[in-house]
Amino acid sequence: MSVRSVIRGSGSALPRRAVSNAEMTTMVDTTDEWIVERTGIRNRYIAGEGETTSTLATEAARKALEAAGVDASRIDLIVLATATPDQTFPATATIVQHNLGCNGGIAFDVAAVCSGFLYALATADSMIRSGMARCALVIGAETMSRLLDWEDRTTCVLFGDGAGAVVLEAVDVDETDPKAPGILATRLHADGAHNELLYVDGGPSTTGTVGKLRMKGREVFRHAVTNLANVLKEVLETTGHDAEEIDWVVPHQANFRILDATARKLDLPADKVIVTVDHHANTSAASVPLAYDTAVRDGRIKPGDLVMFEAMGGGFTWGASLARV
């Protein structure tokens, strides 16, 4: 027997305000056809007054706890992935911890932008396997709208706000049982040589400002497809599974073209890929858990399914994780 981190439940949260492509056309020089053709996005949610990264994260966490049947008092670790914290410090995870009333455990943020949830998941998994924690909340939460240049039509139409969370619990499993639940393997990578392709042009130690998001979309697309396909293969090789065994792929919801191209490169059927980018747009670190929770709640992802999570973000950072849920 050995310890694995098992996903016990998931939750998600969205701001109140939905913004359609039609509404976007009143804000910037664009069209619904242009946005849909290039990205697949039709809608996004934008945070309003009183809605912050921590409020969205707290709501998603509460829903995940409810789905898992776990009381907040049992949570001894919160890892929150975000590029849009409420404040430079303290960590937004500590605010969520206080909101949930589970003070005293471990709580911190990780910053890997769109790959953030996978970095957070790997961190929590490692801490559970090492015995430092037994029951964890892993959260991806963003208010990306507050980093956008609303005069840059090439970027402001792509992003939205939201949060997703999962409860991870330490469980003793028989590793020889192919159906045993838990996270099987995660692989993470980064390459800072390309940080000028996707970045925010501000920060506390440089400009003293928040800054705005800047992106060179074509170059990002090229790197994304190659890196994601390679890291998925790496995880499959590590676990000894074949692509045909995967029940569902839950990718970072950046752009439908990237999702489609990556699936084609791995010969994965399109109907095995969870797609929510049309409804949520790119929610950065929130997109993977938000898509996962959507598919769990609508009945597509079921207990016992083999699920591959994957993402790539600014830095570049990228990774993939395979789990039996």
From Swiss-Prot:
Reaction(s) the record says it catalyses: malonyl-[ACP] + acetyl-CoA + H(+) = 3-oxobutanoyl-[ACP] + CO2 + CoA
Pathway(s) annotated for this protein in UniProt: Lipid metabolism; fatty acid biosynthesis
Annotated compartments: Cytoplasm
Any single GO BP term: fatty acid biosynthetic process
Keyword Chaperone set for record: no
Organism domain of life: Bacteria
Span list, region ACP-binding: 253-257
Alphabetical list of Gene3D superfamilies matching this protein: 3.40.47.10
Predominant location: cytoplasm
Active site: C114, H252, N282
Keywords tagged on the record: Acyltransferase, Cytoplasm, Fatty acid biosynthesis, Fatty acid metabolism, Lipid biosynthesis, Lipid metabolism, Multifunctional enzyme, Transferase
UniProt xrefs under CDD domains: KAS_III
GO cellular component, one term: cytoplasm
GO molecular function: 3-oxoacyl-[acyl-carrier-protein] synthase activity; beta-ketoacyl-acyl-carrier-protein synthase III activity
EC id: 2.3.1.180
Pfam families on file: ACP_syn_III, ACP_syn_III_C
Enzyme kind, highest EC tier: transferase
Subunit structure comment from the entry: Homodimer.
Role this protein plays: Catalyzes the condensation reaction of fatty acid synthesis by the addition to an acyl acceptor of two carbons from malonyl-ACP. Catalyzes the first condensation reaction which initiates fatty acid synthesis and may therefore play a role in governing the total rate of fatty acid production. Possesses both acetoacetyl-ACP synthase and acetyl transacylase activities. Its substrate specificity determines the biosynthesis of branched-chain and/or straight-chain of fatty acids.
Family membership: Belongs to the thiolase-like superfamily. FabH family.
Entry's free-text remark on domains: The last Arg residue of the ACP-binding site is essential for the weak association between ACP/AcpP and FabH.
UniProt name for this protein: Beta-ketoacyl-[acyl-carrier-protein] synthase III
Organism this protein belongs to: Novosphingobium aromaticivorans (strain ATCC 700278 / DSM 12444 / CCUG 56034 / CIP 105152 / NBRC 16084 / F199)
Gene that this polypeptide is encoded by: fabH
